[in-house]
Amino acid sequence: MSFLKKSLFLVLFLGFVSLSICEEEKRETEEKENEQEDDREERSEEKRLLGMIPVAISAISALSKLG
């Protein structure tokens, strides 16, 4: 009976450790995905701003020609 209790305890303990490791890996994966998504959003904002520069330059040059 003592052997069965020890075996059951060992199985439960190892299962708990395995579950904890899986949850930690899942959390790390989600954090990496969130960081990558944030980077993509920042790059798209930068591209949008860089795309507006030629428009702003042409508007300024048109205004300077008028004045």
Curated annotation (Swiss-Prot):
Residues 23-48 form a propeptide. It is found in: Secreted; Target cell membrane. The modification Leucine amide is found at residue 66. Disulfide bonds: none annotated. Its main location: secreted. Residues 1-22 form the signal peptide. GO terms for cellular component: extracellular region; membrane; other organism cell membrane. Pfam families: FSAP_sig_propep. Residues 26-47 are annotated as: Disordered. Belongs to the frog skin active peptide (FSAP) family. Medusin subfamily. The primary structure of this peptide is identical to that of Medusin-PH from Phyllomedusa hypochondrialis (AC L0P402). This is Medusin-S1. The lineage of its organism: Eukaryota, Metazoa, Chordata, Craniata, Vertebrata.
